[in-house]
Amino acid sequence: MTESLFFAPHDLPARWRRTRVFTFVDMTFSAFLPLWQRWRDDEERCDRLHVVAIATLKALDDPPSTDDASPLAAELARAWPMRVAGMHRLEFDEGRVVLTLAIGDDAQAMLSKLWLRADAFHLEATDDPRALCKSLARFAGDGATVCANASGPLHLPMRRALESSGFECSSAAADARLVARFAPRWRVRRHEPPLPCAASAREAVVIGAGLAGCAVSARLAGRGWHVTLIDRHALPARDASGNPAGVFHPIVWRDDSVAARLTRAGFLYALRRWQALEDAHHDLLRSPAGLLQIADTPEDATALAAAIARFAYPSEYVQPTTRADASRIAGVDVARGGWFFPRGGAISPAAVCTAQLADAAARITLRMETDVTRIAHDGRIWSAFDTSGGEIASAPVMVLANAHDAARLAGLYGAPTRSVRGQLTVLDSSALDALRAPVIGEGYAVPLGADGALIGATYDIDDPDRDIREAGHLENIERVAGMLPDLALAPKQIRAGRVAFRCVTSDRMPMIGQLADESAARRDAPQLSGAWPLDLPRMPGLYGAFAFGSRGLVWATLAAELIASQIEGEPWLIERELADAVDPARFLLRALRHGEIGST
């Protein structure tokens, strides 16, 4: 039965033997385990198997039983995600088998939000087959197969919808199951689904060895790429990524905004990647006690408690807290209630960078203490050049992950990034010795054990001063006093300080993805006045991961996986709407739509 359901209609395993990556879209939420087992049993299997399973939130209520005799089912159960909407990427067999769960209120609507190139679809017919089949045609690769259970009155409408969308049906008219292959005789879509970057070799240059660059290097190396990682410092994680600790948590707000959905995706994916590093015996210096966020006002606390209930977030994701509850969690009196993230906390950014590079060391070459003054493309290869004009490294793919300098190297329209100075303060260990968990709100306070306590941070826009200022320390103390009013912090408890510079955009979203070809866009500006992101010309092989602001820990792993997926032509791990919100070309796109640039 399983053989006929998941393999024979799609000519598996023969078809995945002819490709490096095979993508199977499953709308029945039942194909993953049989496919994984068959892939494991096949010595001629593809390098990577992607299964994208689409379902409603209710599907997460029933994880595979840990009592199941199948070891694969038990492994899937251990990796089962939290019960929250959105996309969850689970990785098995050293990342060679990937399950992306796309969870929404309506499975068919969720399908339309994805961005991928599918080799096979497995689904049930619906009472709106035209919309469903248009989505299938939007994502179908050459020769993609469809197997649909379409019995009774659903059969003929489904067959007609498939045929009108460019599929050839091979099933007999009386069959309950429709089998079809994508073979359009006319153009059935505006944009082609994603293809791998046309690289002559699986080699990349990454500029910047902070959280962004180390994460990108690791995700590419994990796919078999050889990466040259360049940084101006002697060691990785020296700028903002060199802070003693950083806090990590998603945004939760009254509506499930783009920012809330993006930070949720980044937070959950980061937890998985960090756990994989810790399972490989890397110490990330991650705090175990969760993270407490203090509301700005009592009204905000009340509104957020209502939103948490309305979205039915599980308690392992976020919990509303009264002032009394929050004080108990923190171990000290807090000013107001708020919300608690049991899986949030603090972590060492430098330890994360070190672990990622160590885990992928065989495929990463470091070029430290090296300044990149310009980059160039000869139509095939990207090259990075030093201050004397010498070539540092070259490769078909380049990723700019060097914060403020990325926009300069790429020559992005309108200088879309700004620098924000942040000064943090390290206090004596006695200052916050009663604090049990990191607390954020107007500022942040992170217990560091014997290393003291970290508080901060100032937010000084366009301030280039690298010197530590007494006024900055006092501002940080004042911020913490507003959250933790019973603590009597004093300047004499200051042990040290540090200044780093955040890179931010005007919309406070990061820049993640392939960069636009701005010269071509300027030349074709009249034709692009009504463009969408997929309409824009792109720089072949050039990507960006920068402008992470204060959320580098949440953005970095998400950015790395999204960029690696774009380079490899794999399914994206977030909805296309969310990817558009962080697209580095979004400012150019707005300017084109508003007629602000032309062919002058």
Question: Positions of the model-derived regions?
Answer:
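Short beta-strand to alpha-helix junction loop
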Residues: 147-149, 258-266, 294-300, 339-358, ...
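Dinucleotide-binding Rossmann-like beta1-alpha1 core, especially the glycine-rich loop
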Residues: 246-329
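C-terminal catalytic lobe of FAD-dependent flavoproteins
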Residues: 490-600
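Helical element adjacent to the flavin cofactor pocket in flavoenzyme catalytic cores
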Residues: 339-388, 392-397, 401, 406
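A short glycine-rich, Lys/Arg-flanked "PGG" loop and its adjoining helix->strand segment in the class I
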Residues: 130-142
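S-adenosyl-L-methionine
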Residues: 64-112
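Helix-loop-beta segment of a Rossmann-like dinucleotide-binding subdomain
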Residues: 70, 254, 283-293, 317-359, ...
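Active-site substrate-recognition segment that forms the wall
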Residues: 177-178, 187-223, 232-233, 237-252, ...
